[in-house]
Structures are given as C-alpha cells and as structure tokens.
Amino acid sequence: MGIEVELLDYGATLKSIRVPVGDNFVDVLLSYPANEDYLQDKVYLGATVGRYAGRIDSGATRVQGRSIQLECNEQNTGHCLHGGPKGFSHQFWSVSERSSDHVSYEYVSADGDQGFPGCLTTRVSYRLLGSNTLQIEFTAETDQETIVNLSNHAYFNLNCIDSGVENHELMINSGLYTPLGSNSLPMGEIKQVADSIFDFRQKRCLRERLYSPDAQLDLAGGFDHYFLLNKDVSKAGVAATVYSPQSGIMMNIYTDQPGVQFYSGNWLGAPFKPRAGLCLEFQDVPNEPNMDGFASTILRAGDTYRRQITLEFNCLPGNR
C-alpha cells in the first residue's frame, strides 16, 4: 500500500494525506468534516497561500520604486497576511492537468488583485513519487515586476487518534531564526539558534520547548517564527523531520525554499483545539520587501518563479 492524497480545487488545497500503518491508514492532516466548510476557513487549512505567504507590515511596500498598498486582512495587527482577504487560498483554481499520480492547478491573478502589481499566472502541481512521497511544485510568471512568495499551509498531526501534536518530535535543519517584534513580524534581526529553545537541529519534543519560559513564545503564544535553512538543504539534504512516537510515522521534508515558518497551531478555532496540528510553511521570509539582508522576492516579466516541497513518509519498524 502507498499513501493516498485528496485535493480540493478551492485554494488548490491539500485536504488529506493517508499514510499506511499496518493494515490501516492514518490521515496526517487536519481537515474539515465537509468540503463546504473550507469556504468559511480562516486558518488556511491545507491551502496554497499567495501571492505573498506570511505577513507584510501594514500591507505597505514598494515595487519598481513606487509605493504599493496591499489589502490588509489581519484584524489584530493590520497586516496583509497570506496575500490579503481574497488571496490564492480563497479562490477556485482550474485543473490544468490530471492523471492517476498527479494534478496540476492554475490560477490567474489580475493586475491590481489585492493591491499587487502585474498579472500573475500561478501553477501548483501535486505529484506522487513512488509509494510514500508527495511532491508539490509552484511556478509563477508575471507580465510586470511584482513580488511573489508561495507556500502550502497544511497542518500536520502524525498521531493515529484525535490528539494534539505536543508529543511530536521536530528537527529543523537551521542554525538561524528571525525574532519577532511586538507587531508579530520579523524585525530584520537574525539570531543563532544555539543555546536557545529555537535549536531544533536535533529532534526535540515540542512539549519540552512549548512550555519553556521565553519572551518570544509569549509574543506568539507558542512558535510562529521563520527559520533560515542551512545551505546544504538545497542539495538534497533533509530540511525538516517530524516524528510521532505514538503512531511511528516519520515525515522527512526536502525543499529548495530558503526557509520555513514554523507555526505550532497556537490559535486554530472551532472545530479544532489549540495545537491540534503544526505547520511547516516553506517559503521566503515574511515582510522581505520591507527588510534588507534577505533574498529578494521580486519576480520580473520574462522570469519564472519555481519552488518545490517534497514530503516523504515512513513508518518506523515496530509500529506497523
């Protein structure tokens, strides 16, 4: 048996990944009971997020030397979050290709959509590789200079029963992270993870870290921080690993993205409890257009944005 994947046209959403464990399957993603529930979603459950994943400070930035005001949708901060109130996560995508092992979606975002310049054509492809691996590929092209930062917002829970993720073990192949300011955004500062609760270079139990006294955790109610991945990750190194000792399921993630936003599911809302799932949003740094020292998220006409995220699942011996 191999993994089984379920997708939705709305948000080009990754709804379900069922992983074989013994004679049964474990769905490792949080999902709503009915497909119609996704139309009211407020936490981006499994969705493709864009045009810009993460927050942009007050929705204000500059492109081609001119000021741009984006639509803001995060009520408690006034920021533009995940592309605005009608971003990619809240749109119906067209199926451009379909076969037994892959589906490709396409969405055309008009010039000025949510305040972003340029007509942007975006494609998201989900492809099964072998029996235990799912590859997600994002591509985008524009007719004028704009900013692009795409990711998937799946909430993972590798346990085989209805429980949270605090018993999960997490490894992030990163020696650097970006602290948050009081406005829930990176401040442009980069810190070493060494000798801090942000050191996930070896697998760590989330429960041990989540309840450690730390001002950064207090700001976000847990983890909601960006980690810069080590350089060797893009050369087929493992970017992150999640393991559940309860189910025995291990997920290794590979990517060519420069970093990952780790969100410990601090605020989910009904029907979910806090920390029912965790997010690993592989992407560029939030608010990059307003900071110096990070890789540019500018996409120019004639160029192609292309990024991949690969999820590999295994069940460790003794748990089958």
Which residues does each predicted region cover?
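An exposed, glycine/acidic-rich loop-and-rim segment of catalytic or binding clefts
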Residues: 1-320
